[in-house]
């Protein structure tokens, strides 16, 4: 599949999805819990990550109550797995300032295609695709489904600065974007956090809440990154790239901009928020991340 073909073909595919978003999803709350638990359980590529949470802090506090790093194990062996490697290849492709327009080389666009190809080779994404097809929420054609994923996650949109197309859902979620007041938005990838921790650019301040999902650990915390701050963000430590993409895609289809209650492999329920943005008539992922306190 070539990304160049996505531009023309996918307008129709995403248009059909947008039409669906105007009606109630066929996916029930019980089905969300079941399929998300299966996705967590089947995440065979997930990493075993050891955390040193240290001291608890409060939402809104930027006081540093944690002298050490949060990740104290070495996940580099996991980072060599195909989906992790494809994920890492994307991280340096983005302008992190919302005032600067993103531009991409053919090689960088090919890395986006390679990432979608890699995750679709996993049982997690294949299980998600099978489920969505069974509910009439996705095409059975794998190529069409890949194109759908590419558009909702990598399609570019403008929101923060008029006329500047500086964002995508994948960038916003997995990297971050710096606003004009030096605060940051997005930033939900534990993989990217680890990279910045190792480079000395991320200062762990302490945790607000934690949740054990069986295979991953959800943590909310304030962020101090490159001297820019965010008062509250969330990470799903240990999750593979395909699990996070699957959960975000599931909630984009089933509960866009609504409470999307999912289940960990141990049955722990929590919200997965997939916020959307509509740009030039097309609906995209804006951000995708876990939150606490499920609204059942």
State each model region's role:
Residues 1-3, 295-296:
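A positional/structural detector of protein chain ends, strongest at the extreme C-terminus
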Residues 2-19:
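Cleavable N-terminal signal peptides of Sec/SRP-targeted secreted and luminal proteins
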Residues 20-264:
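N-terminal "domain-start" segment
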Residues 241-296:
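Compact beta-sheet-dominated globular domain cores
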